[in-house]
């Protein structure tokens, strides 16, 4: 079945209309999932029993299990999540004076092969769906009871190699009826997939972008980052 968290608001409206329901129900479902943080359709009490049954028959609500949690002396927490298909991903919660920031994964493993990155040791398996990305934020908020103020796409995987799902996740995170995190509090970190950088710049989203250089010249950067052979500094 489809994970209902994989839909942004407009897609969910379209999906509901396609199954004979009113589009405005999407806003109600969004509120239940992202603001009330319910874990089942049965808890969505302003939806009819008939609609709740239809949702249960056609969709799931993906909820992660925490496999392991580590906490450092400064309050930083690392989470290992079971993503319900036999794979696992990591997220890191960091506390700052301005709020709580989470570093999320966008893929299971990574293709980029950067020598300095721990993700290089994890073989690429697949990209995460939008809902699987967003669920990292929801699961950590549930565990801590605190609101996350900043999201950084700097965990396992290259975000721009999973462009469509990362973009959809950003739209869910930024939507006032969704997770409601300001776009300027969402940052995407990339090893430098230039065509996708241009694509992101053309989106109507004011998120921030960080490019990992790690060297001031192409020779040194290529020795550490294979992506530089395709998209170099020059």
What are these regions (language model features)?
Residues 72, 105-106, 119, 189, ...:
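Short linear Ser/Thr-Pro motifs
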Residues 1-100:
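Flexible, acidic/Gly-rich N-terminal and inter-domain linker regions that tether
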Residues 121-150:
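Conserved alpha-helical substructure of the radical SAM core
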Residues 83, 108-110, 213-215:
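Short, small-residue-rich loop/turn micro-motifs
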Residues 141-150, 155-234:
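Conserved AdoMet/S-adenosylmethionine-binding subsite of the radical SAM
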Residues 95-132:
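Canonical Radical SAM [4Fe-4S] cluster-binding loop centered on the CxxxCxxC motif
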């Amino acid at each position: 079945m489809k994970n209902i968290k994989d839909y942004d608001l407009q897609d969910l409206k379209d999906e509901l209309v396609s199954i004979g329901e009113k589009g405005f129900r999407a806003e109600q479902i969004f509120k239940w999932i992202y603001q009330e943080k319910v874990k089942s359709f049965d808890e969505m009490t302003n939806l009819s029993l008939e609609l709740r049954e239809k949702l249960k028959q056609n969709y799931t609500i993906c909820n992660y299990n925490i496999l392991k949690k580590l906490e450092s002396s400064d309050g930083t927490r690392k989470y290992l999540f079971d993503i319900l298909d036999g794979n696992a991903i990591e997220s890191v919660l960091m506390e700052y004076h301005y709020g709580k920031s989470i570093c999320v994964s966008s893929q299971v493993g990574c293709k980029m092969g950067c020598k300095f990155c721990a993700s290089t040791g994890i073989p690429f398996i697949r990209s995460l769906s939008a809902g699987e990305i967003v669920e990292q934020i929801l699961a950590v908020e549930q565990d801590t009871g605190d609101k996350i103020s900043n999201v950084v796409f700097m965990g396992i995987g290259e975000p721009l190699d999973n462009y469509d799902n990362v973009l959809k996740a950003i739209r869910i995170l930024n939507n006032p009826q969704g997770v409601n995190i300001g776009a300027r509090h969402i940052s995407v970190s990339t090893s430098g997939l230039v065509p996708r950088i241009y694509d992101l710049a053309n989106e109507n989203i004011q998120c921030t972008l960080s490019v990992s250089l790690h060297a001031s010249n192409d020779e040194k950067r290529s020795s550490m980052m294979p992506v530089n052979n395709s998209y170099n500094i020059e």
